[in-house]
Amino acid sequence: MKIHCCRIVICVLVAVVLTGCASAPLSLWQEKAPARVALVEYVNAVTDRGSADYIPVERRIAVFDLDGTLFLETDPTYFDWLLFEHRVLEDPNYRATAEQTAVAKASRQGKFPKLDKNRERLVSEAYRGMTLSEFDAFVRKFMQEDQPGFTNLKRGDAFYLPMIEIVDYLRKNGFTVYVISGTDRLTVRPLTKILHLPPHQIIGSDSTIVSDRQGNRDALDYIYTRGDQLVLGGKNLVKDLQMNKVSVIVREIGVQPVLAFGNTMSDASMLNYTINGNPYRALGFMLLCDDLEREYGNLKKADRMRRDCRKYGWIPVSMRDDWKTIYGDQVKIRKKAPALKKGSQEK
């Protein structure tokens, strides 16, 4: 009953943020936080028809990274990799390969693989043959599990409430919001239902999708017909990080964003593309993982990112200093932080 009640509290908090019931814009932020002040001033200027900085509604495009920007990425690592571990080690309906099992067991001990093509191959292959609805249900079920490093938090609820507040604030001011994630698109869609964004505004990495009757035939040689069912093909096509984020923005949005939010150097190209050579006033924000009390932060990484913000002209967002809460006050971090060993995943 206690867990059920806590989940209700989280849902109510999110509902308050998304319905604008808070008394002031960005009320979960410290009022004088530099990032909040900069964003509110910017939005006021670009939405004022009498301002020299006015941006027409159709050009008000904001892009957000997911992991570490909108959503937890440090307990102990990315949602998509934890989903892979679950698939390989705990799903009775899946027969994992020896390679998948060895890698998943090693990662349970904190030895995470690098974010390279081999990692993406392993992840994609783990879901080969699943229908789109089966995979969607698999993700949603995993979202209902407890977040191990926190009390009173489910995996699917691990969103940064102050950042959800920004998404809603921008939408209320005529911005179109896109999520540009390195996580697979079909994983991100159910995970981000909380944002109430249409599927075409959720962009992520891509793997092949094929017909269940296609066999080994190339997509150019196969005609989809009545009775075919779409299944995951098990081959990664693109990892949506760094320059690939810029490419996907050009291909799928077709408009240069005016706001960009990220948290690591894998988002650097997206932020720099946003703020450089833009016909409109534009800003880029980078989150600093500097909170050790309410989140599994890393001060060394945070200090490095703060230096990068000065170098590239990004606005730093301090999770520790700028936010009144992260997941809601009912959520508490467990005492022992999960340690990331040498060679751990980092975007």
Predicted regions and their residues:
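Short catalytic/ligand-binding loop motif for oxyanion handling, primarily in non-cytosolic enzymes
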Residues: L72, D80, T187-V188
